[in-house]
Amino acid sequence: MDPCQCSKSGTCNCGGSCTCTNCSCKSCKKSCCPCCPSGCTKCASGCVCKGKTCDTSCCQ
C-alpha cells in the first residue's frame, strides 16, 4: 500500500502525476508529496511529518 495515498482533507496522489493538495497525510513516500514543510530534508526511506515547522522533530 502506498502511504502517500492518504488524503484526509485533501488529495494525495503518488502515481504518474504526483500531487499533494491540502493533504493531512502523516507520511509520504520519499519526496513525492510535500508533506513536510519546504526546505525540510526528506528521510531516505520515506518521510514522517510530526509538525508544520522545519526542525529536528519534523521527520523521523
UniProtKB/Swiss-Prot annotation:
Write out the transmembrane intervals.
none
Annotated spans, Beta: 1-28
Q: Which InterPro entries match?
A: Metalthion_dom_sf, Metalthion_dom_sf_vert, Metalthion_vert, Metalthion_vert_metal_BS
Source superkingdom:
Eukaryota
Residue ranges of region Alpha?
29-60
Query: For binding a divalent metal cation 3, which residues are annotated in this chain's numbering?
Result: 14, 18, 23, 28
Residues bound to a divalent metal cation 7: 49, 54, 58-59
What is known about what this protein does?
Metallothioneins have a high content of cysteine residues that bind various heavy metals.
The UniProt family comment states:
Belongs to the metallothionein superfamily. Type 1 family.
Q: What is this protein called?
A: Metallothionein A
